[in-house]
From Swiss-Prot:
Major glycoprotein, comprises over 80% of the envelope proteins present in virus particle. It is a single-pass type I membrane protein. The keyword Transmembrane applies. This is Hemagglutinin. Homotrimer of disulfide-linked HA1-HA2.
Length: 550
C-alpha cells in the first residue's frame, strides 16, 4: 500500500527567513559576537583630508594668527573687517610686528573667534600733550617704520608726558571690545627717553571692572631687533557703560573698538587645504561626513559632528540573525524551515514560504512581514545620530603655563567625557542590536503562528518550521495560505481522513516491532497468572502439599 503522504493527497509548506553565506558580527547585550545578515558601521574613522567651504564660511588665516589679524599686524591687513564661521590658523603663521604677549591669550582668541568678525570702528580719542602714532623698525609697513594698525603708541611730546584721562561712553546697543596695551622698556634709559617718568602706570576702567598695569622694565630675549615687549589687554564695554583710560606713561592706546556679535563662530588650527565642497562637520584633519553618529578622527570639531569615541568600529545591526544553510540542499533536497536554518536563495524578501505539492515546488516572499521589520529598523540609524551628533563645536582648550593645573583638570574632564561617551556608545549600540534581533525573530514567529491558526487541524507542525498538510493543496491553495484567505473548513474532512490513513499506516509499519514485544510480554504475564492460580487451587483441594520450614 502506498503512503498517502507520498501521493497527491498531501503537501508540505515551510516558513523561513533569508540568510547570507557570510554575515556580519555585531555585539548585543547578551552576546558579544552574534552574526546578522547585514550591519552598518557607526564610527567615521577617516576624513576627506580637506576643509569644505560650504555651508560654513571658512576664512584661511594663511600666515596670520587670529590675534595678529585682530591687532593689525602689517602683513595681516588683508583681514581687516573680515567675517567667518571658522577661522583656520596655519602652523606656518607668524608675527611680523613689535614683539608682544597676551596674558589672557586663550580667552581673547576664543572671544574674538566666537564673534566671527573683525569689524572695527574708529573713534575720536583725544590724547593731549603726547606724541601719537609711534612706530618701530620691528614692524615695517612698507619701507617705513610702523605699528599695529588698531593700536596707537603714545610717547612724550617734547620733554613732557602729562597724565592722560580719557573717557568714551558706549551709547550703542551692543558690546564693544577695546584692545589696548602697556609697553615694557628694556632699560630705565629707554623708559625716560619715551615717557619721561621713571615708572609709568596704566589704568583702564568701566563701571564693572578695573585693570591697573605697572610696566616691568628689563631686558628680554631679542626678537626682531627688540628686547622690549608690549603686553596686550582687552576690555568689554556694555551698552550704557563708560570706558575710562588713565595713564602717566607706557600706554598703547586703542584707536576704536571691535563690534562684538554673538554666534557659534570659532577658530581651529589646521594645515588641511580648503576646497570647494559641502560638509557640515570640520576637524583639523579635514571635513568628515556626519551621516554616522560617532567618529574617532579628532576630538576637535566644528559644526554638526558625530560624537568622538575611542572605538575604531561599532556596528549597528540592520538585518536579522544570520543562520546560514548547513549544506547545499537544493530547493527541496532536504526541506527545512526557519528553526533549522535560514534560506540563502531568498532575495525578494526577508521572510517567506517554500512549498512542495502535486504541482511541484515553489517559493515566495511574505512582503507584509518583511516590510514590518524593515520599517522598524530603518529609523534606528537616524535616531542614534539625533541622540549623539554635536549641534555646536568642541573648541581647542589653551592655557598659559601659570594655569597648568587648570589645564590638567580640563584634560581630565575631557578624557572622562570621552570615556563616558565611548561606554555609552557601546551600550547604546548593543541595546539597539538586541532590539533588532528580537523584533526580526518576533516577525518570524508572528508569521508562523498566523499560518498555524489558519491551518488548524488540517496540518501538523513538523517541528522544524514546516507544516505537513493532510489534504490536496495545489498552488492556488498554497497562495490562499500565504495571503490569509485559506478556509480550513473546506478541506477539513479530507484532511482528517488522510491523517487517519497516514497514522494507521505509520502505526502498522513503523511500530510493528513494538507491538510484537508488547504482545509477547502480555502473553507471558497471563501464562504466569494462570499457573499461579492453578497452584493455589490445588493447594486448597489438598492435591498439592506445600511445607514451609523456618
Amino acid at each position: 500500500q502506498d503512503l498517502p503522504g507520498n501521493d497527491n493527497s498531501t503537501a508540505t509548506l515551510c516558513l523561513g527567513h533569508h540568510a547570507v553565506p557570510n554575515g556580519t558580527i555585531v555585539k548585543t547585550i547578551t552576546d558579544d559576537q552574534i552574526e546578522v545578515t547585514n550591519a552598518t558601521e557607526l564610527v567615521q574613522s577617516s576624513s576627506t583630508g580637506k576643509i569644505c567651504n560650504n555651508p560654513h564660511r571658512i576664512l584661511d588665516g594663511r600666515d596670520c594668527t587670529l590675534i595678529d589679524a585682530l591687532l593689525g599686524d602689517p602683513h595681516c591687513d588683508v583681514f581687516q573687517d573680515e567675517t567667518w564661521d571658522l577661522f583656520v590658523e596655519r602652523s606656518n603663521a607668524f608675527s611680523n610686528c613689535y614683539p608682544y604677549d597676551v596674558p589672557d591669550y586663550a580667552s581673547l582668541r576664543s572671544l574674538v573667534a566666537s564673534s566671527g568678525t573683525l569689524e572695527f570702528i574708529t573713534e575720536g580719542f583725544t590724547w593731549t600733550g603726547v606724541t601719537q602714532n609711534g612706530g618701530s623698525n620691528a614692524c615695517k609697513r612698507g619701507p617705513a617704520s610702523g605699528f599695529f594698525s588698531r593700536l596707537n603708541w603714545l610717547t612724550k611730546s617734547g620733554s613732557t608726558y602729562p597724565v592722560l584721562n580719557v573717557t568714551m561712553p558706549n551709547n550703542d546697543n551692543f558690546d564693544k571690545l577695546y584692545i589696548w596695551g602697556v609697553h615694557h622698556p628694556s632699560t630705565n634709559q629707554e623708559q625716560t627717553n619715551l615717557y619721561v617718568q621713571a615708572s609709568g602706570r596704566v589704568t583702564v576702567s568701566t563701571r564693572r571692572s578695573q585693570q591697573t598695569i605697572i610696566p616691568n622694565i628689563g631686558s628680554r630675549p631679542w626678537v626682531r631687533g627688540q628686547s622690549s615687549r608690549i603686553s596686550i589687554y582687552w576690555t568689554i564695554v556694555k551698552p550704557g557703560d563708560v570706558l575710562v583710560i588713565n595713564s602717566n606713561g607706557n600706554l598703547i592706546a586703542p584707536r576704536g573698538y571691535f563690534k562684538m556679535r554673538t554666534g557659534k563662530s570659532s577658530v581651529m588650527r589646521s594645515d588641511a587645504p580648503i576646497d570647494t565642497c559641502v560638509s557640515e562637520c570640520i576637524t583639523p584633519n579635514g571635513s568628515i561626513p556626519n551621516d554616522k553618529p560617532f567618529q574617532n578622527v579628532n576630538k576637535i570639531t566644528y559644526g554638526a559632528c558625530p560624537k568622538y569615541v575611542k572605538q575604531n568600529t561599532l556596528k549597528l545591526a540592520t538585518g536579522m540573525r544570520n543562520v546560514p544553510e548547513k549544506q547545499t540542499r537544493g530547493l527541496f533536497g532536504a526541506i527545512a524551515g526557519f528553526i533549522e536554518n535560514g534560506w540563502e536563495g531568498m532575495i525578494d524578501g526577508w521572510y517567506g514560504f517554500r512549498h512542495q505539492n502535486s504541482e511541484g515546488t515553489g517559493q515566495a516572499a511574505d512582503l507584509k512581514s518583511t516590510q514590518a521589520a524593515i520599517d522598524q529598523i530603518n529609523g534606528k540609524l537616524n535616531r542614534v545620530i539625533e541622540k549623539t551628533n554635536e549641534k555646536f563645536h568642541q573648541i581647542e582648550k589653551e592655557f598659559s603655563e601659570v594655569e597648568g593645573r587648570i589645564q590638567d583638570l580640563e584634560k581630565y574632564v575631557e578624557d572622562t567625557k570621552i570615556d563616558l561617551w565611548s561606554y555609552n556608545a557601546d551600550v547604546l549600540v548593543a541595546l539597539e542590536n538586541q532590539h533588532t534581533i528580537d523584533l526580526t525573530d518576533s516577525e518570524m514567529n508572528k508569521l508562523f503562528e498566523k499560518t498555524r491558526r489558519q491551518l488548524r487541524e488540517n496540518a501538523e507542525d513538523m517541528g522544524n518550521g514546516c507544516f505537513k498538510i493532510y489534504h490536496k493543496c495545489d498552488n492556488a491553495c498554497i497562495e490562499s495560505i500565504r495571503n490569509g484567505t485559506y478556509d480550513h473548513d473546506i478541506y477539513r474532512d479530507e484532511a482528517l481522513n488522510n491523517r487517519f490513513q497516514i497514522k494507521g499506516v505509520e502505526l502498522k509499519s513503523g511500530y510493528k516491532d513494538w507491538i510484537l514485544w508488547i504482545s509477547f510480554a502480555i502473553s507471558c504475564f497471563l501464562l504466569c497468572a494462570v499457573l499461579l492460580g492453578f497452584i493455589m487451587w490445588a493447594c486448597q483441594r489438598g492435591n498439592i502439599r506445600c511445607n514451609i520450614c523456618i
